[in-house]
UniProtKB/Swiss-Prot annotation:
Residues 109-163 are annotated as: Pre-S2. Pfam families: vMSA (PF00695). The keyword Lipoprotein applies. It comes from Orangutan hepatitis B virus (isolate Somad). One of its GO terms (biological process) is virion attachment to host cell. This is Large envelope protein. Residues 78-105 are annotated as: Disordered. The lineage of its organism: Viruses, Riboviria, Pararnavirae, Artverviricota, Revtraviricetes.
Length: 389
């Protein structure tokens, strides 16, 4: 045990590996231990901690056998080197020569120059090789080879590389437009609810608007009149209010579109006198262009008389459109003519009155802002229409 680096005697074995005489092990067979590796063990009388805990590692050829590992001797064997590569010994072999084309593709050898020229006599085949307006003769001049043998042999041209910048920009633009449109749509959908809240608040001055009807959660609880459930009696009135609000928004958009088209000159209208179908009489002049050939942005309204020339009225298109609407409305609603003196008086007011009006607007501005704030999401749409139409 001189070379055993294990622990001291854990189970009480004697130095010569004989069991304790208390168990009568040495009476009949004093040499019962046939371990050939017996040696003097000075530390046999010491009790220590075994390799697997206190008193669990017998020395030498005990419970673990006679192997070198059981006796605490560890043998380190050198690593076996990998076998030498056969490729390095024999070297790289050359690539075998490809067999000739007549052996691998015999069908290609049947398509020679004679057959090719005969096939070119067919107009359908000729159209594949000659563009429109090209040579109509039956002979084909060979195209000189400009590619070098090295480049044609080793350079394989596949699909062209994709331009990721153009692809990303092509996707980014519609994505931003979709995101902006979705944002504006969510804001526009809040307009009817905001106007509905303002409308219902007029009936509850000084208090919170509450609908005394029933809802699906509780038959007696109150709720906002702008969020009535279908079983509530106020649900039909809420739908009616929002329908009127939608019509008002559509009318507002239509008026803006008509004013924009008229400002761009795409809606040439002429002011009509009440009850007449002819243009108004005023400081007119004879144009040198015909009526169908009017410019895109006319500066006056034109009619086409019998001589082929147009008589222009020097009125800006927007004023002409406003006058046309006023004439159309005054013919059908005669009481609007009573407002003409008031409008003329209001237009001739002194600067003091205008300052008073400005002060009133400044005083009532916050409340007007609360009323007009739902229409703010419509401003970007109007601006885009104004810029691109």
């Amino acid at each position: 045990m001189g070379q055993n680096l294990s622990v001291t005697n854990p189970l009480g074995f004697f130095p010569e590996h004989q069991l304790d005489p208390l168990f009568r092990a040495n009476t009949n067979n004093p040499d019962w231990d046939f371990n050939p590796n017996k040696d003097t063990w000075p530390e046999a009388t010491k009790v220590g901690v075994g390799a697997f805990g206190p008193g669990f590692t017998p020395p030498h050829g005990g419970l673990l056998g006679w192997s070198p590992q059981a006796q605490g001797v560890t043998t380190i064997l050198p690593a076996v080197p990998p076998p030498a590569s056969t490729n390095r010994q024999s070297g790289r072999r050359p690539t075998p020569i490809s067999p000739p084309l007549r052996d691998t593709h015999p069908q290609a050898m049947q398509w020679n120059s004679t057959v090719f020229h005969q096939a070119l006599q067919d107009p359908r085949v000729r159209g594949l090789y000659f563009p429109a307006g090209g040579s109509s003769s039956g002979t084909v001049s060979p195209v000189p080879t400009t590619a070098s043998p090295i480049s044609s042999t080793f350079l394989k041209t596949g699909d062209p590389a994709l331009n990721m910048e153009s692809i990303s920009s092509g996707f980014l633009g519609p994505l931003l437009v979709l995101q902006a449109g979705f944002f504006l749509l969510t804001k526009i959908l809040t307009i009817p609810q905001s106007l509905d809240s303002w409308w219902t608040s007029l009936n509850f001055l000084g208090g919170a608007p509450v609908c005394p009807g029933q809802n699906s959660q509780s038959l007696t609880s109150n709720h906002s009149p702008t969020s009535c459930p279908p079983i509530c009696p106020g649900y039909r009135w809420m739908c009616l209010r929002r329908f009127i609000i939608f019509l008002f928004i559509l009318l507002l958009c239509l008026i803006f579109l008509l004013v924009l088209l008229d400002y761009r000159g795409m809606l040439p209208v002429c002011p009509l006198l009440p009850g007449t179908t002819t243009t108004s009489v005023g400081p007119c002049r004879t144009c040198t262009i015909s009526a169908p050939g009017t410019s895109l942005f006319p500066s006056c309204c034109c009619t086409k008389p019998s001589d082929g020339n147009c008589t222009c009225i020097p009125i800006p298109p927007s004023w002409a459109f406003a006058k046309f609407l006023w004439g159309w409305a005054s013919v059908r609603f005669s009481w609007l003519n009573l407002l003409v003196p008031f409008v003329q008086w209001f237009a001739g007011l002194s600067p003091t009155v205008w300052l008073s009006v400005i002060w009133m607007i400044w005083y009532w501005g916050p409340s007007l802002y609360n009323i007009l704030s739902p229409f703010i999401p419509l401003l970007p749409i109007f601006f885009c229409l104004w810029a691109y139409i």
